[in-house]
Amino acid sequence: MPRFDALYEDTRKQLLILPSWRRSISGAYDEKTSSVYFDGFVETDYFKFYNGLINDERLLSKMREKGYKGLFCLHPIFMKQYVDFQNNDVFDVNEGFVDYNKVFAESAAMVTDYSTIAFDFAYLKKPIVYTQFDQKQFYEDQVYDKGFFEYETDGFGPVCYDLDSAVNELVELIDNDCKNKYIDRVENFFVNIDKNNSKRVLDAIIEDDKKRNK
């Protein structure tokens, strides 16, 4: 994809957590901010999982030991819920819009769930951990169906279905300096990993235009 050409690397000891949204627990839509505060948010499994993850003492202890910091970025639809999450000395909860290319560049590893931004991060050959504690409900509630991409067999990292397994994977990952064990999947999935995606698309458009005008 052409947008991959804008990706760059400035890797630091940072763990990025960037999950998608949930239709069933989002507040009403606001034209100016795209979201409103949802009063029942703290009672949801979504909040309990991610607040538990960024405050898990095993994970925090390992990150302190290895000198890592964490950045938790909510989806824009959930942006106003940042006040519900508990900050600590390791994790910052982002309060506004995200410069995705910047946080991708600076992060050594990423946690996400079903978000397609995982493809951008994987393109940088950096490790990903998927957190899908609500997989069945997610596909029942969202506005789109499960596609051909199977996370367990096609994904760019382990799939975790509960908090304990997610913490275990992250502790091991950080303990090994975020070495990517799924690099073969990344290299087999992407035909080209370079800065020439825009050129290839443009060349294909020009070639197609020539054929149409013969």
Task: Show the residue positions of the predicted features.
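Donor nucleotide-activated moiety binding/catalytic core segment of transferases
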Residues: 71-119, 124
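Catalytic binding pocket for nucleotide-activated donors in carbohydrate/polymer assembly enzymes
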Residues: 84-89, 114-189
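Soluble or luminal CAZymes and related metallo-dependent hydrolases
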Residues: 48-55, 99, 158, 162, ...
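Short, solvent-exposed loop/turn segments at secondary-structure junctions
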Residues: 20-24, 75-79, 116-118, 134-137, ...
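C-terminal alpha-helical cap of glycosyltransferases
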Residues: 194-214
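A short acidic, often aromatic-flanked loop/helix-cap motif at beta-alpha or helix-coil junctions
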Residues: 2, 99-103, 164-168
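Conserved catalytic-core segment of nucleotide-activated headgroup transferases in glycan assembly
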Residues: 1-84, 160
